[in-house]
Curated annotation (Swiss-Prot):
Taxonomic path: Viruses, Duplodnaviria, Heunggongvirae, Peploviricota, Herviviricetes
Protein's name according to its UniProt entry: Membrane protein UL121
Residues passing through the membrane, by range: 143-163
Subcellular localization: Host membrane
Species of origin: Human cytomegalovirus (strain Merlin) (HHV-5)
Keywords carried by this UniProt record: Host membrane, Membrane, Signal, Transmembrane, Transmembrane helix
Amino acid sequence: MWGCGWSRILVLLLLMCMALMARGTYGAYICSPNPGRLRISCALSVLDQRLWWEIQYSSGRLTRVLVFHDEGEEGDDVHLTDTHHCTSCTHPYVISLVTPLTINATLRLLIRDGMYGRGEKELCIAHLPTLRDIRTCRVDADLGLLYAVCLILSFSIVTAALWKVDYDRSVAVVSKSYKS
């Protein structure tokens, strides 16, 4: 009876871990690297040269920041973009924008859609209604997910091993007393 209950718990834990890994972190991760600044990161499976960030303020004003600048083109000093490759992540390319702290704004990562640049496709979106929605930057979103999954899997394996040892001992004791 105990074995059946524990096995169900382990199966549920493993299914939760698989769901987390399959989902990845395709959404946006928002944090504040220092006071007055905001960092938004989006994990993608493919890197493309046609990416840009769009910030829509509550006043209706739009700001667009290219992720990749041409060599002759100057970048924006107020908004900084960053890309890095994460080898252990579900979606290996992390695109980030560091911008002045903005409340009541919507931030989107967009890609030009179509052969001739007509239209756009939204890859990530984040709404910033209050300061409570922003946390301090500690661990990258994908690494945090990876650590959580590893911790859950490790706990599951240790629990299963301990249960197996306990079960084998109880079976051995019962069979010894039954034989005598």
